[in-house]
Amino acid sequence: MLSPDQIHQYDEQGYVIPDYRLSDDTIEEIKIAHKRLIAKSPQFSDYCGALLIEDLSFLNYARDQNILDMVSQLIGPDIALWNSSFFAKPAKIGTRTPWHQDGEYWPITPLATCTVWIALDNTTINNGCLKFLPGSHKGKRLESHHLNNSDDIALPLSLIHI
């Protein structure tokens, strides 16, 4: 569960790093499922935008009760999984994703949603971790995705083995 401080951070900054982590076994299961997906459909080696259409086994990870409990703390109890994607971004050689706002691509109005990002490997600034602009969720939606990087922050994460 998220603490009141973590919920406040999400409301103000647009992100939170929960203490909860999937187990090593679960992370390994996801990696194996991804390898199986690529073996069946090599075109998804970098990105699969409709993951559950291709492999329903990934739904098990979206149903993780601890994750659902945290999401419900942020957006309420009426949760609908409307998309699940897999981005494979090997360190330094993975396909770059340019700056964007997810909401520009999502068919949801009002934009009462959130994303759960599950890193399967350690991420660092040097190998290309997730970056975001804190608080940008509170402003008006951007029409253009050309941004100045001066206010961004990086989100390096180390996997915690449990």
Protein language model regions, located:
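Conserved hydrophobic/aromatic beta-strand scaffold that supports enzyme active sites
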Residues: Y15-I17, T115-A119, C129
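Phosphate/oxyanion-binding loops and surfaces in catalytic or ligand/nucleic-acid-binding neighborhoods
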Residues: L37, P77, T123-N126, G139
